[in-house]
A protein has these predicted regions:
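N-terminal beta1-alpha1 cap of cysteine-dependent amidohydrolase-like domains
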Residues: 1-89, 125, 205-257
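A glycine-centered loop/beta-turn motif at secondary-structure junctions
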Residues: 163, 174-218, 229, 233
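Catalytic nucleophile loop
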Residues: 86-110
């Protein structure tokens, strides 16, 4: 699907939210800092998916449903079609957790249930390509070392789409992050966590899993650096990629800087 208008600088980025407790967190603030208008589309509240012609970028959040749960959540199929259209139009796309699985599925990769739950504070290890990546690579975001602190909450996992670049792994789940093209990223893990999201998550986490303030602060600090780089690369056209608002009656929320 080709872009009908090559200049989308004034069009809002759509954040597709699937459940109340998995909002954009730091993603929305970083976009606002760059002057990017954001529309949060609450699919769990019955909001309609936007047209590809109306968005300047796409962020797809997590949720407890799975890629294959289309009987219970019929919008999942439409969301994948929108993701594919955004990739084909060379728009910036960020998929987080379920969103990464949806991105992988939209690009033809298999999504399956894994052997174990991966839940709670942790880290991912960057691959050789991940260490050189303009978003995740320490040379670009100022991080030290080759690991990225994050929060995990998943069991489903994805195969890598064809022609994608593998960026990060854990021992339990080697496919933690990938890039397709220069501006489409899938992150199985969460770096958007801030104090508000952590507060919403704590009572929902499995017994024995804690999310202490120190872990949240580390993830928020690192996450903002990673997200800053993602937005910078997206807005620059990714030339170097070779190495809250109020709800309206549709269920969408408009956030503007």
């Amino acid at each position: 699907v080709a872009r009908s208008d090559p200049d989308r600088s004034g069009r809002p980025w759509a954040v597709l939210q699937h459940v109340a407790h998995e909002g954009p967190g730091s993603i929305a603030r970083v976009l606002a800092e760059h002057g990017v208008p954001v529309v949060v589309v609450r699919l769990d509240l019955g909001a309609r998916l936007p047209s590809i012609d109306d968005v300047g970028g796409l962020v797809v959040m997590g949720g407890p449903m799975g890629v294959h749960d289309t009987d219970a959540f019929p919008w999942l199929a439409g969301e994948r079609a929108l993701i594919r259209a955004a990739v084909d139009a060379d728009l910036a796309v960020l998929g987080v957790c379920l969103g990464a699985q949806q991105l992988a599925a939209a690009l033809g990769a298999a999504v399956t249930t894994g052997p174990v739950d991966e839940v709670g504070p942790g880290q991912v290890e960057l691959t050789a390509d991940g260490r050189r990546d303009p978003v995740l690579g320490p040379e670009y975001n100022g991080l030290s070392g080759t690991s990225v602190p994050c929060v995990h909450w998943h069991r489903d996992t994805f195969a890598l789409p064809g022609a994608s670049t593998h960026l990060a792994a854990t021992r339990a789940y080697p496919h933690q992050a990938f890039r397709t093209g220069t501006r489409a990223y899938g992150l199985q893990f969460h770096v958007e966590i801030d104090a508000d999201l952590a507060e919403a998550w704590r009572p929902l986490l499995p017994s024995g899993i804690t999310l202490d303030d120190g872990a949240v602060a580390r993830v928020e600090d690192v996450g903002r650096r990673v997200l800053q780089r993602f937005v910078e690369v997206a807005l620059s056209g990714a030339d170097d990629a070779d190495g809250a608002g109020t709800a309206d009656d549709t269920g969408s929320t408009v956030v503007r800087s």
